[in-house]
Amino acid sequence: MGKGNNMIPNGHFHKDWQRFVKTWFNQPARRHRRKQNRIKKAKAVAPRPAAGPLRPVVRCPTIRYHTKVRAGRGFTLREIRAAGLNPAFARTIGIAVDPRRRNKSVESLQVNVQRLKEYRARLILFPKGKKVLKGEANEEERKLATQLRGPLMPVQQPAPKSIARAITEEEKDFKAYQYLRGARSIAKLVGIRAKRLKDAAENPDDVTKAPTAVKRNKT
């Protein structure tokens, strides 16, 4: 049958069509194989978390999705150092590091630094050699260690807490989309406008260098 408001398909079968029928009888076996591979991987990385290394909390790209958060590729070098860790050491204790990523806001830096500190507080670090160093677990603590099979510190969407109240006249007149578009335009053209003002100050007689003010109509 067709899906949605689309045309009902007609196969027009010709030329011994039975030979070209695709079957999916291997789906149960594939499901079993995926499960066995997950178990095999969990045993190989034990006692480390089966889900892999810790990932940062990042915003989704584009205006459409930037209100949502998800798990990113790796923590920035700035986040790692702000949490009191070394990037090389962080990789050895199950923390993903992405040197290409940059922090564009103080909020993202604070959230991920707190995430790293919380992970470090929960972590039971096994000693590499016979001698137990500072920050490593002793024998009693190592006996309590169990492998985490589920998601490692899953990312949760921030729930907005709003109280019901009357909408003010100022809020009714405020156009959020136009305000955001204007703010992005100002941020984009700040360098061009600064250069234009500088050129106009250096050449006061040049009419082409003078800044032009454009008055926009209210919509």
Curated annotation (Swiss-Prot):
Q: Which GO terms describe its biological process?
A: translation
* Cellular component aspect of the GO annotation: cytosol; cytosolic large ribosomal subunit
GO molecular function ontology, one term from the record: RNA binding
Q: What domain of life does the native source organism fall in? A: Eukaryota
Keywords noted in UniProt: Cytoplasm, Ribonucleoprotein, Ribosomal protein
Give a short account of what the protein does: Component of the ribosome, a large ribonucleoprotein complex responsible for the synthesis of proteins in the cell. The small ribosomal subunit (SSU) binds messenger RNAs (mRNAs) and translates the encoded message by selecting cognate aminoacyl-transfer RNA (tRNA) molecules. The large subunit (LSU) contains the ribosomal catalytic site termed the peptidyl transferase center (PTC), which catalyzes the formation of peptide bonds, thereby polymerizing the amino acids delivered by tRNAs into a polypeptide chain.
Task: State the name under which the record lists this protein.
Answer: Large ribosomal subunit protein eL13
